[in-house]
């Protein structure tokens, strides 16, 4: 590994000197370095064909060279089959976890991650991957069963590796399971270590909302800045406007909700924003309400007309399906507007938190050598 680290540091220095940009920010410029590393790893593998480090890193290099993920997984499966009698359970768990990353979440079960777990994997990445798999299943079917399984794995991951992401993922899944007080404590502890982190402040505002602490929730919301956090760079560190503005709706802060939405409403698909129409109605913003209604009805009717005259369909049946779908959208929209005009109760919306869907590849080149 020392030889590889030395090569990586030399490559990094050479790249940044030549291109005056951070290492690996441009694929075409990075390609020669990945190719050289592949050559180095292949030479090392000839000397020691049973070396797990080399096999796992070789798969990672192939991924960087844009081989298919299936190819990367097959490399490791072949290595495992050829060397299974001389590999420890930890080695096998490591390989299975890496394969689980390459295979992804397309299969009905996370087969290889579960194999790693069955070998008592000591790697946090195994349990992070399992947590992400079951949380994604929860997002798909909104089922408590998958959420509770995800919580179990996120908790295991954070006991092994006490980094930010594992704690955040665990807290986010607790929040989704309505364990607001437990989630709040974790978010508070994280905020003490990562001050002014916008995602944590927003998460705390969500917790306070559902704990009934309206003033605390509003205090946190007032600090949140939308967009990418200036100081942190994970995907969850980017906050969309609606994630903040919808919070004011839940808090019954309707004027603030409408004021905030005014500047961004044109950026979103609003046909199903029942809560927005409801707020316009109860705040007696009838002109804005009917202006939006009339423009939306016109748009939906125009979609139907265009579909009826459009001949760019694969078959008459496909054309009829599109026309039917547009007509159903118009019927649903008009029904929603009538419900609001008739004085429907306040539409409920959800304020969701999501885990950080980051890399859980144990032998990721970028994380292994750049951290």
Predicted regions, residues:
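Structural register within alpha-helical repeat arrays
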Residues: 6, 58, 92, 99, ...
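Short coil/turn linking the two alpha-helices of tandem helical-hairpin repeats
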Residues: 11-24, 59, 63-67, 100-107, ...
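Eukaryotic alpha-helical solenoid repeat scaffolds
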Residues: 11-33, 37, 210, 218-371
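Canonical positions in the second alpha-helix
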Residues: 44, 79, 83, 115-116, ...
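Short coil turns that delineate tetratricopeptide repeat
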Residues: 49, 84, 90, 121, ...
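Start-of-helix register in tetratricopeptide repeats
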Residues: 53, 90-94, 125, 163-166, ...
């Amino acid at each position: 590994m020392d030889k590889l680290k030395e090569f990586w540091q030399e490559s990094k220095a050479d790249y940044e000197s030549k291109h005056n940009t951070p290492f690996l920010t441009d694929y075409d410029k990075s390609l020669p370095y990945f190719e050289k590393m592949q050559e180095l790893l292949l030479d090392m593998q000839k000397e020691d064909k049973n070396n797990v480090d080399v096999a796992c890193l070789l798969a990672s290099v192939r991924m960087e060279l844009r081989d298919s993920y299936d190819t990367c997984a097959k490399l490791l499966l072949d290595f495992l089959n050829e060397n299974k009698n001389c590999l420890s359970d930890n080695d096998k768990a490591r390989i299975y976890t890496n394969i689980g990353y390459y295979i992804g979440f397309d299969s009905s079960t996370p087969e290889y991650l579960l194999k790693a777990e069955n070998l008592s994997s000591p790697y946090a990445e195994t349990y992070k991957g399992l947590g992400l798999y079951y949380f994604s299943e929860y997002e798909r079917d909104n089922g408590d069963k998958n959420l509770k399984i995800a919580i179990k794995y996120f908790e295991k991951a954070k006991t092994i590796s006490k980094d930010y992401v594992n704690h955040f993922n665990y807290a986010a899944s607790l929040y989704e399971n309505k364990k607001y007080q437990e989630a709040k404590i974790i978010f508070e502890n994280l905020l003490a270590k990562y001050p002014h982190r916008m995602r944590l402040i927003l998460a705390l505002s969500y917790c306070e909302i559902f704990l009934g602490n309206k003033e605390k929730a509003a205090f946190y919301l007032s600090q949140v800045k939308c967009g990418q956090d200036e100081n942190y760079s994970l995907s969850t560190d980017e906050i969309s406007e609606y994630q903040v503005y919808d919070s004011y709706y839940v808090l019954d802060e309707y004027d603030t909700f409408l004021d905030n939405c005014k500047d961004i409403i044109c950026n979103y698909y609003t046909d199903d924003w029942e809560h927005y129409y409801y707020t316009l109605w109860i705040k007696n913003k009838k002109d804005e309400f009917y202006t939006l209604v009339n423009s939306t009805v016109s748009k939906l009717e125009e979609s139907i007309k265009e579909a009826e005259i459009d001949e760019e369909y694969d078959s008459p049946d496909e054309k009829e399906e599109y026309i039917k779908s547009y007509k159903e959208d118009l019927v649903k929209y008009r029904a929603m507007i009538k419900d609001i005009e008739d004085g429907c109760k306040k539409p409920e919306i959800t304020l969701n938190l999501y885990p950080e869907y980051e890399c859980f590849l144990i032998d990721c080149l970028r994380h292994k050598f750049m951290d």
